[in-house]
Amino acid sequence: MLRFGLCCIFLKEPIKFRRTTAKYLQAFSRNQQLENLSAICRHNAEALQKALRYCRDNKIKDFRINSQILPLKTHPAIGYRIKELSAHEQIIRTFKHGGKFCRDHDVRTTLHPDQFIVLSSPHSEVFQRSVADLIYQAEVAQWVNADVINIHGGGA
């Protein structure tokens, strides 16, 4: 069955996913960084719920989740484990609620990690960071009941 879907961002709907930068967060203590990231991740989990409801209400059967739904998750200096975030239980619960919603309403979710995920890289550091990012994407996929993670398979 052919499913038309939405990709990550809404132009006209008041559904916004938040991001941040490592440069911005580096000005703060580690605790402040984690609190900021916790608020952003909680917001993004809630925004995903709105996006999924929008898809259901408009008979859109697929939604591609932005690869930065948990911003900077695997960043070498700012990265974090989800359990380090003060709102981690609420964040995970909200994502899992989204997964149940998708099952109940036949809305498919997919993920598409960024183009810098290069498993074929001859550089060990690039390969290791790619694997870490895919593990993070797989964790999110499990929470939201996503059955596909598209990856780039190009040469190095």
Q: Which sequence ranges carry the predicted segments?
A:
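Alpha/beta catalytic barrel-like cores
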Residues: 1-107, 117-120, 125-128, 139-144
